[in-house]
Each structure stands twice: as C-alpha cells, then as structure tokens.
C-alpha cells in the first residue's frame, strides 16, 4: 500500500526492516503449518503453492474467499497468509455454533488487537487489558438510541442541530455554481462532528482540535496498525514511535481526562453523552472497578469504528446516487412526504424514509467492506458438533462478500437494486428484518451474535440524515460525468476511492 511504501522510503532502516520481517514471516508460517486443520485448502497447488498464495494475499484475498465459498460452501476451507493459516467457516450450523461463544473460547478482540495492533494504536483496550467491555459499551449506545426515540427527549433534535452545524462548517456550497465535494474527506469530518457530539457531548464536540483528532484518528488506526503489524513483536515498540495513531491517542487521552476533571469542578458529571453515562453507570453499579482512564480509553477506541466504516458506506452511497439518477426523484418524494407527515427533521421522519434506508443497505451490500465477517481467534482447542477441531491460536471467519453475491440468497445479486430490501420487507410482511441496521446470518456486514456492532443504529441515523439533506438541497453528479469512481482492494477489504469527488449544485426550489 502507498502508506507502507512512503513510510519505508522516509526511514533509512526500511530495507533492513524488510529483511527482518521476511525472516520472521517465513518462520511464523512454517511454525503455523505444523497445526493440523483438516479442512480443504484453497490456493496455489504444489510444494510452494501455499507460499505463493500467501504472497498474493494482499491482492487476491477476495478471489480466494469467493473460490472457497463456491467449492466448500457447505463446510469450511483454509487459506494461507504469510504468518499463519486462516479458516473460513461456511456451514450455517457451524457459524451459529461459534458466533455466540465467549471470548475465552473464540476471541473477537484478539483479532482486532492483531489486525490494528491495538496495544499500540489504542492502548488500554487490547486483549487482556482491564477495560470497559463491549456489552457495557453496547448498553451505553442502547441508552442513547432510546433517547433518540423518546418524543420528549431533546437528544435527536440536538443531533440534527449538530449535523447542520457540521455541514455549514465543512461544506461551503455556493448559492450558484458547482461545488466539488471531496467525499471521504468531508464525510469523515461531518461524521467526526456527530461522533464527538455522541461520545463527549457539547461544547467539547465544537472544539476544532477534537474534530481534527477524531478525524485523523479514524485514518491513523488502520494505517499505523497495518504498518506495525509487519514487524516482529520485539521491534513493535520502536516502530510505533514513528506512527501517528499512538500520538493522537495520547493527546485524546489527555483532553478527555481533563474534561472529566473540569466537569467535576463545575458541579458533577451528568449523563448527557456516552462518556458521562459510562462514568455514572460504573460508579453506581461497579464502584471502584473502572477509573477515568479505562473509560476514556474505551471512548478513544470507539472512534475508529464509528468514523471510518460509517464514512465508507456514506461515500459508496454518494457514488451510487451520482451515477444512478433514476433513484434521485423517487427518494426526494419519499423524503418530502416523511418530513411533512412527521413535522420536519425528527426521528419519526427519518424512520419513515424506508426506500432511502433500502438504498443505503443495497449500497452496502453491493460494495461489501470485508469479504469475511465474525472474525475470531481460538483461545483454546475447540471441537464443533460435526467433529471438526480448531486448534488453539487459529484465526477463523465466516464468508460475507460471497453470501451477499449468492443468487440463491439474493436473486440477481450482481445487479444493483436500490429497492431490494424495501421490496423484501413488503413481500415478507417483516420490514424491520430488512432495515439497514438489521442483522442475520445472510447479512453479516455488522457481524451477528455476541459481537454484533453496537453502533450500527447511530451509523444508520447519520447516513440517512446526511443523504436526505443532500437529496433535498442539491443536485448530485460525478465530475465531468465520468462514471462511478472505482473501488480498490487490500487483502479482504474493499475501499471506495478516497480521493474522488462528486459535484453538488444547490437546487433552486427546496420545500423541505
């Protein structure tokens, strides 16, 4: 990747590091091959086949996962990485069996810790650290979600207010003429404003440094994490000193700890945001167990997932809208109707935009972030009911991308249908099962089971609010009508073009 190459070019020790990393990777892979995992192998054949496939993983991972799903979709298969085997569990019963296991059997945080090198990029939240649990963070987000739905609670109106403030700050569209919107850059900053409002509240969310740090941290975690992961454990403390995520994390920690102290001086900590709610809930229910440091660490770790993934879905939606004009007017009609029926930009109005919700979900389905989902590491030997044993230390995942393009599950899956999920909801009489934030084993974008993404409801509100605002106030097109910007792939991950722009032009007549 570009960030890896540029990092190596900046440092005189780059060549030596590559040699050391290569030796370490070969040693690790040789050691991992001794693990006996009795599932079919997918990749190059022959004595050197696994080595070649491992070297091609960065560019061929999604193809290998698709091939494995097509050949072994009723069971499981393994693929070779430079330092280990990974096992893809395809069988529905087996997925159901492992997705709800406790972390002391199949650990999700272990995967995240290794992929993004959380020990260095989000210290205090790595595997084994004393930290706020994911279920407790989920409880906090559920509290906030319930506030959004409560008619007499000001939270959602404040959320809309924050969006309008962020849009005005970040998107200077002229009254006349075109405006080139840098989709990812601007989207990330707007989402950072909203994430800050949710996590740390007003007025801290209006602090320009906080917005900058939230935005930068969302990008720094994957780039720093991927770079640090290239090196043996003994070199990582040294390498981390050259990466931005640890520095940003340290600065955020200082600001948030200072905020706690300030709130106490000014009369106490109120439950008006996630940070305050966690402080009060833990004081009341688990006094003395968690300090300010554990709470602020959990807030910081939440930032990456909250900003980067939400922004990517938003960008895909903008690209699809700009190149599929047939959806624009019908969606505007629905948005206008929902706003009029419910009295403006209120929670009920956003929930009434069911075709817009379907369009967003189809954009996500058609451009799946990860070819896999439900990634776990076996923390002890585990035997499935069908007799397959997964050795301790093995990484497993379930197919995601291949499921979303399986014609037996999604008819004409290679065709984009913005109303696909709306129609499925109407046909089955269960519209809630097909909303953007809904999950099941046929739609694993947010995971499923024990570690389902707890922030998906907030992401849904953010994306619907932004797209509805754009549709009602602007015409949208690609630059020079050149077509949809191309996605790019790294390993199993698919990214939108992060440099691409769309053209916004203020509409002459806006009734919303």
From Swiss-Prot:
CDD domains the record matches: CYP503A1-like (cd11041)
Q: How does it sit in the membrane?
A: Multi-pass membrane protein
Q: Which UniProt keywords apply?
A: Heme, Iron, Membrane, Metal-binding, Monooxygenase, Oxidoreductase, Transmembrane, Transmembrane helix
The record ties this protein, via InterPro entries, to: Cyt_P450, Cyt_P450_CS, Cyt_P450_E_grp-I, Cyt_P450_sf
Q: Its domain of life?
A: Eukaryota
**Cofactor(s) essential for the protein:** heme
Any one GO MF term held by the record is: iron ion binding
Q: In which pathway does it act?
A: Secondary metabolite biosynthesis
- Provide a GO biological process annotation: paxilline biosynthetic process
Record-linked Pfam families: p450
State the GO CC annotations.
membrane
Q: What top-tier enzyme class does this entry carry? A: oxidoreductase
In which residues is heme bound? 453
**Phenotype of gene-disrupted mutants:** Impairs the production of paxilline. Leads to the accumulation of the 13-desoxypaxillin intermediate.
Query: Where does it mainly reside?
Result: membrane
Name where it's found.
Membrane
Q: What is the E.C. number?
A: 1.-.-.-
Residues spanning the membrane: 3-23, 35-55
User: Its function?
Assistant: Cytochrome P450 monooxygenase; part of the gene cluster that mediates the biosynthesis of paxilline, a mycotoxin that acts as an inhibitor of mammalian maxi-K channels. PaxG, the geranylgeranyl diphosphate (GGPP) synthase is proposed to catalyze the first step in paxilline biosynthesis. Condensation of indole-3-glycerol phosphate with GGPP by paxC then forms 3-geranylgeranylindole (3-GGI), followed by epoxidation and cyclization of this intermediate (by paxM and paxB) to form paspaline.
What family name appears in the similarity comment? Answer: Belongs to the cytochrome P450 family.
Any idea what this protein is called? Cytochrome P450 monooxygenase paxQ
From the broadest rank down, the organism's phylogenetic lineage runs: Eukaryota, Fungi, Dikarya, Ascomycota, Pezizomycotina
């Amino acid at each position: 990747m570009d960030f890896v190459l540029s990092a190596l070019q900046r440092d005189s020790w780059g060549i030596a590091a590559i040699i050391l990393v290569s030796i370490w990777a070969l040693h690790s892979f040789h050691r991992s091959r001794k693990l006996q995992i009795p599932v079919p192998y997918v990749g190059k054949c022959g004595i050197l086949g696994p080595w070649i496939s491992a070297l091609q993983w960065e560019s061929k991972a999604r193809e290998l996962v698709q091939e494995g799903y097509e050949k072994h979709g009723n069971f499981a298969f393994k693929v070779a990485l430079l330092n280990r085997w990974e096992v893809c569990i395809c069988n529905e019963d087996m997925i159901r069996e492992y997705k709800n296991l406790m972390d002391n059997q199949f650990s999700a945080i272990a995967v995240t810790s290794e992929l993004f090198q959380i020990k260095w990029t989000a210290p205090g939240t790595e595997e084994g650290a004393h930290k706020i649990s994911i279920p407790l963070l989920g409880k906090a987000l559920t509290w906030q979600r319930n506030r959004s739905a409560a008619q007499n609670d000001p939270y959602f109106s404040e959320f809309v207010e924050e969006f309008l403030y962020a849009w005005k700050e970040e998107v200077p569209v002229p009254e006349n003429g075109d405006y080139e919107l840098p989709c990812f850059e601007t989207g990330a900053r707007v989402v950072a404003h909203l994430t800050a409002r949710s996590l740390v509240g007003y007025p801290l969310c209006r602090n320009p440094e906080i917005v900058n740090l939230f935005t930068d941290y969302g990008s720094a975690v994957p780039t720093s994490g991927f770079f640090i992961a290239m090196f043996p454990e003994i070199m990582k403390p040294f390498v981390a000193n050259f990466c931005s995520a640890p520095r940003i994390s340290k600065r955020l920690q200082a600001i948030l700890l200072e905020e706690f102290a300030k709130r106490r001086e000014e009369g106490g900590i109120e439950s008006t945001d996630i940070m305050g709610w966690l402080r009060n809930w833990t004081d009341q229910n688990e006094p003395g167990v968690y300090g300010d440091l554990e709470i602020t660490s959990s807030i910081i770790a939440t930032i990456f997932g909250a900003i980067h993934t939400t922004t990517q879905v938003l960008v895909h939606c903008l690209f699809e809208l700009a190149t599929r004009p047939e959806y624009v007017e019908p969606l505007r009609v629905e948005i206008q109707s929902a706003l009029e029926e419910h009295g403006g930009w209120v929670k009920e109005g956003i929930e009434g935009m069911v075709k817009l919700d379907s369009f967003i979900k189809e954009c996500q389905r058609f451009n799946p972030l990860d070819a896999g989902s439900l990634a776990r590491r076996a923390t002890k030997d585990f035997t499935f009911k069908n007799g397959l044993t997964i050795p301790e230390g093995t990484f497993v995942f379930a197919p995601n991308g291949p499921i979303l393009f399986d014609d037996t599950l999604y008819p004409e899956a290679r065709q984009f249908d913005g109303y696909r999920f709306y129609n499925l909801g109407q046909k089955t009489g269960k519209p809630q099962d097909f909303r953007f934030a809904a999950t099941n084993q046929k739609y694993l974008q947010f995971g499923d089971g024990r570690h389902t993404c707890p922030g998906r409801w907030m992401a849904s509100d953010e994306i619907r609010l932004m797209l509805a605002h754009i549709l009602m106030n602007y015409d949208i097109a690609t630059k020079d009508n050149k077509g949809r910007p191309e996605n790019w792939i790294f390993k199993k991950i698919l990214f939108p073009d992060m440099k691409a722009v769309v053209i916004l032009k203020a509409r002459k007549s806006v009734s919303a």
